[in-house]
Amino acid sequence: MYKRQVNYKVAKSFTDTVKEKALGQNVLTAVKPSQLMVKIVHDELTALMGGETAELELNGRPAIILMSGLQGSGKTTFSGKLARMLKAKKNRKPLLVACDVYRPAAVDQLTVLGEQIEVPVYSEPGSKDPVQIALNAIHEAKAKGYDLVIVDTAGRLAIDEQMMNEIEAIKKAINPDETLFVVDSMTCLLYTSPSPRD
């Protein structure tokens, strides 16, 4: 953990807790010590990351999910996976919305994903107004009977005030049922790593 730049205090607390639990366990004859150790580490990692799974609150008609996150964190890919899962397991009729107006291939990527999973994609080629695109998509979803709208937005950094204002404006305009923040641990590592030294 330390080599992967996890905060020292977090890593120390985690390893101390794992050690304490491992030393305090009586190993059942049916369980190997290595299996017990894997379970303890898994349980502690789960607790460290929040511990509980929460269901999505998708009560609106259509229900709206706003995707947000850092640049390159996988929002577009996750949007497609989420649409496929909710379509298959929750019998939803999703519409994907391409609101990343900055990355040239973003609309194409979402369109290809939509075709692969047989989920339509709403886009407005040439438009540079993601707020209006999202509002128009919701209007179309209502008109065509889609019960789920997944809005894929551009990646951003907290230090980019214009982009932060944009995601705030989108959220205010569409009032989503859920806002999901997509994070990739390697991307976060890149953003938090110190700059290279000569």
Tell what function each PLM region has:
Residues 1-4, 191-198:
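Conserved small/polar residues in nucleotide/adenosyl-binding loops
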Residues 3-99, 106-127, 134-153:
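Primarily NTPase-proximal linker/entry elements flanking Walker-type ATP/GTP-binding cores
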Residues 101-104, 127-128, 155-158, 185-189:
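Conserved nucleotide-binding/hydrolysis micro-motifs of P-loop NTPases
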Residues 106-107, 159-164:
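Conserved ATPase-coupling elements of RecA-like P-loop NTPase cores
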Residues 109-113, 166-169, 193:
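Alpha-helical scaffold elements adjacent to nucleotide-binding pockets in ATP/GTP-utilizing enzyme cores
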Residues 131-135, 189-190:
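Structural motif
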Residues 165-184:
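Inter-motif core of Ras-like GTPase G domains
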